Swiss-Prot record:
GO MF annotation list: structural constituent of ribosome
Pfam family for this entry, one: Ribosomal_S16
Record GO biological process: translation
Biased composition (Basic and acidic residues): 99-110
The protein's name: Small ribosomal subunit protein bS16
Region described as Disordered: spans on this chain: 88-116
Keyword vocabulary terms for this entry: Ribonucleoprotein, Ribosomal protein
InterPro entries: Ribosomal_bS16 (IPR000307), Ribosomal_bS16_dom_sf (IPR023803)
Record family assignment: Belongs to the bacterial ribosomal protein bS16 family.
PANTHER family assigned: 30S RIBOSOMAL PROTEIN S16 (PTHR12919), SMALL RIBOSOMAL SUBUNIT PROTEIN BS16M (PTHR12919:SF20)
Cellular compartments per GO CC: cytoplasm; small ribosomal subunit
Source organism superkingdom: Bacteria
Length: 116
């Protein structure tokens, strides 16, 4: 059974409220879960203590059992100091597109020609 620590959405339309839960990865997002580990309220200010609440002991237990946090929950765990900060590297996003690469090449050729 592949365990995930993830967010389960609650609240009403345009008023989201999330529960941090430990569940089987095959279950629906808001479906059955094994344990509620905390809450996340994105509507509160970022510096509010009530924005993210977690039961640290239970989160550590599930991590020791092999549960994998989702990306957003992993960021919460990094902020709480429960997990090492993952290096996020997307080198393909920094590579210019075809058109910009052609323009840069032409600009370099013009600069080389004017330097001669």
């Amino acid at each position: 059974m592949a365990m995930k620590i993830r967010l389960a959405r609650g609240g009403s339309k345009k008023r989201p409220h999330y529960s941090i839960v430990a569940s089987d990865s095959r279950m629906p997002r808001d479906g059955r879960f094994l344990e509620k580990l905390g809450t996340y309220n994105p509507l509160l200010a970022k510096d509010s203590e009530d924005r993210i609440k977690m039961n640290v002991e239970r989160v550590q237990y599930w991590l020791s059992q092999g549960a994998q946090p989702t990306d957003r929950v992993a960021r919460f765990l990094e902020a709480a100091g429960l997990k090492e900060k993952a290096v996020r590297n997307n080198p393909k996003a920094a590579v210019p597109g075809k058109r910009m690469a052609e323009l840069a090449k032409k600009k370099a050729e013009r600069a080389a020609a004017s330097a001669e």
